[in-house]
Every structure is written in structure tokens, then in C-alpha cells.
């Protein structure tokens, strides 16, 4: 097994622990994955999220810094780092990161929501309201997209069932 394969296995073990809220064990496994593959951005991002769940903002920020260095186009890394900065009390850096996440992905509802919460916290109600409106809009768009995709899938399924029934009726 190669280092990357072993790192992937440790990553999967770490994520299994994360899912069941064993954040300490998750961090241990993800750290092993990072040791084996120091460019494993997703392992850094996931370990940072686990640190964030344990209220270890400093460690989380360090991991999200690594992700940003490895993948500067990761809107999620900026968003998560913004959450860590906010948790550490650095609202200015948090706002900068939420803004950067939204520059990278203008449809990133979670970043709008986080920024709205921060705006509300620092007394910028008008900006918070604008961001909540955007979250609402994006939610409606996502629901509509899901419904449309589901309708297309269902139409195709009904067509296939009809063809299958026709074949059965014709004795094929």
C-alpha cells in the first residue's frame, strides 16, 4: 500500500469518527493521514472542522491556513476559517474570510448565513438582512433545482416502466 493509499485509509477512519462525534479520535486519524501526505488538503480541512467542534479555534485556523495555501480557490476553507476567527473573537478577519468565500462562490449560502450572523452580532442589521434575503433566495433556487431534477428523473423512470410494460404485453 502506498503512502497516499494509507493516508486515504486514515482519512476515512478519521471521517468515520467525525460522523459519530468522536472528534478527538477523528483528529488523531486525520493527523496520521496528514503525516503520510502533507498535501492532503481535505484531511487538513476535516481536522480543522474537528478542532472547531472542540472549540480549539487556534488549531482550526492553522489547519484552514494550510488548506488555503494548498488550494487558494477553496471557498469552504475561507468560510470555515472565518468561523474559527469569529470563535476566537477576531471579527474583522472573520468578515474578511466570509467575504473571500463569497467572492470565490457567490452561491455559497452557508457563507452568507455566517456573515449575516456576524453582521447581526456587530450591529450591522441592514447588511445582515440583505444576507438573510440571499440565503432565502438561494434556498428557493436549490429547492426548485432539486424538484426539477427529481421531475426529470421521475419522467425517465416512468418512460422506462412504460417501455418495460409494453415489452411484457408484447411477450418479449
Residue ranges of predicted features:
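Alpha-helical tetratricopeptide repeat
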Residues: 1-172
Amino acid at each position: 500500500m502506498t503512502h497516499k493509499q494509507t493516508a486515504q485509509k486514515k482519512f476515512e477512519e478519521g471521517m468515520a469518527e467525525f460522523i459519530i462525534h468522536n472528534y478527538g479520535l477523528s483528529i488523531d486519524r486525520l493527523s496520521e493521514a496528514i503525516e503520510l501526505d502533507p498535501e492532503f488538503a481535505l484531511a487538513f480541512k476535516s481536522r480543522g472542522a474537528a478542532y472547531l467542534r472542540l472549540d480549539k479555534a487556534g488549531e482550526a485556523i492553522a489547519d484552514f491556513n494550510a488548506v488555503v495555501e494548498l488550494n487558494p480557490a477553496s471557498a469552504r476553507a475561507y468560510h470555515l476559517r472565518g468561523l474559527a476567527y469569529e470563535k476566537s473573537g477576531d471579527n474583522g478577519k472573520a468578515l474578511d474570510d466570509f467575504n473571500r468565500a463569497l467572492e470565490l462562490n457567490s452561491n455559497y449560502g452557508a457563507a452568507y448565513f455566517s456573515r449575516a450572523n456576524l453582521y447581526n452580532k456587530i450591529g450591522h442589521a441592514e447588511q445582515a438582512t440583505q444576507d438573510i434575503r440571499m440565503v432565502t433566495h438561494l434556498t428557493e433556487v436549490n429547492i426548485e433545482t432539486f424538484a426539477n431534477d427529481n421531475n426529470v428523473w421521475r419522467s425517465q423512470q416512468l418512460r422506462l416502466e412504460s417501455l418495460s410494460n409494453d415489452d411484457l404485453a408484447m411477450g418479449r
